[in-house]
């Protein structure tokens, strides 16, 4: 690959991934503003679906907490904590705001050259109860789509869970792609989707 081709790829890939998020969140209104100061704080990850997950992965992961700390330049330092047996695993990363409200790019500077690019979009939130988050990551071998359902407490309304299911459907995710909660018998309200 010549230098001009590499330059073209570097300059156009962010726009391509950004347009994928817009197209892939169809059926949900585009955010016109995003209040970072209201979004910051502790959230519980109560729903997680991913096109690379399978039913057999459910035993490996469970509900976890995530803390969004607002830093300078409207960046978020994100710290996740999950218990596995008697251990608590934590991992962190930085989200850099993109051009659209509620859209971010995951900072991979410490990951070395050729690190995967990940675009993250808050699709919908009321800031006090729930948030629906869509993540798209391009690796060298596949596109990874992840949908997360965040809650400020451990209980969510049926309508919110229905919205989560509807968003996963727009991403062509099936019930087999759900890590949690187990929604194999859940039938969402057809008026929500």
Swiss-Prot record:
Q: Does the keyword Disulfide bond apply?
A: yes
Q: Which InterPro entries match?
A: Calycin, LCN2/LCN12, Lipocalin, Lipocln_cytosolic_FA-bd_dom
List the GO terms this entry assigns under cellular component, sorted alphabetically. Answer: extracellular region
User: Where does it primarily localize?
Assistant: secreted
Q: Per the record's keyword annotation, is Secreted included, yes or no?
A: yes
Where does the record place it? Secreted
Keyword field? Disulfide bond, Glycoprotein, Secreted, Signal, Transport
For this UniProt entry, which residues form the secretion signal?
1-19
PANTHER family according to UniProt: EPIDIDYMAL-SPECIFIC LIPOCALIN-12 (PTHR11430:SF12), LIPOCALIN (PTHR11430)
The similarity annotation says: Belongs to the calycin superfamily. Lipocalin family.
Designated name of the protein: Epididymal-specific lipocalin-12
Species for this entry: Mus musculus (Mouse)
Lineage start: Eukaryota, Metazoa, Chordata, Craniata, Vertebrata
């Amino acid at each position: 690959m010549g230098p001009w081709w590499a330059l073209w790829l570097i300059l156009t890939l962010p726009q391509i991934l950004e347009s994928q998020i817009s197209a892939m969140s169809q059926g949900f209104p585009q955010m016109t503003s995003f209040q970072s100061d209201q979004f910051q704080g502790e959230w519980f990850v109560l729903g997680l679906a991913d096109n690379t997950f399978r039913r057999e992965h459910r035993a490996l992961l469970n509900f976890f907490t995530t803390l969004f700390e607002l830093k300078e330049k409207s960046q978020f330092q994100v710290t996740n904590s999950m218990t596995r047996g008697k251990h608590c695993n934590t991992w962190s990363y930085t989200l850099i705001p993109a051009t659209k409200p509620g859209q971010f790019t995951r900072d991979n500077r410490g990951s070395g050259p050729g690190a995967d690019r990940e675009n993250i979009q808050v699709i919908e939130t009321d800031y006090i109860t729930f948030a629906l988050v869509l993540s798209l990551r391009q690796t060298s071998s596949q596109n990874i789509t992840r949908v997360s359902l965040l809650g400020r407490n451990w209980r969510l309304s049926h309508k919110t869970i229905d919205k989560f299911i509807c968003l996963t459907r727009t991403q062509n995710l099936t019930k087999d792609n759900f890590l949690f909660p187990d929604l194999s018998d859940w039938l969402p309200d057809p008026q929500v989707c």
